[in-house]
Amino acid sequence: MTEDQLEQETLTWLQDVGYTHRYGPDIAFDGSSPERADYRQVVLPFRLREAINRLNPGIPVAAREDAIKQVTDLGIPSLLSANRAFHKLLVGGVPVQYQKDGETRGDFVRLIDWAHPEKNEWWAINQFTIKGPHKTRRPDIILFVNGLPLVLLELKNPADENANIWKAFDQIETYKEQIPDVFQYNEVLVISDGTDALMGSL
């Protein structure tokens, strides 16, 4: 089995469990169905906005837009600190304030419907090009939930003795340095050679 075959097998399995497969070049800014403004953008803004609007109908539009801004611009230079801050927003909701009946009210905008998984949008995207500060990289598969890149999978050729899962681990470590923005939103990292697999976090 080649690395490409392993990637296709993985995508087939992901579709079997409910993910929608999208091909990275198709949803690029210059693709047939663009979902991002450029290769630097790691969140899919249209998907995120649609999900926030769908899951939070009782919160005013301006507050929902504020939540989107908070999520897409975490404003924290440290990767680990940004990742922790996003995790808090993902689990507990994004804090917002708005005026109602002459009073300032506080609420939380949900990014995911934890109680009803079927109400979320699950995408598995392969060959998703990301432009970092100095390098451009393309991880094998990224899993998006409501437009958020929560899981990154790096695969290696099971037939190549020199390309085991630890090579995939080294690749992810390189990605952290070269395309750090996508890791701000990461919840799970997966490495596999088709026989062995490991998962973890930052």
Give residue ranges: language-model regions.
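An alpha-helical interface "stripe"
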Residues: M1-L202
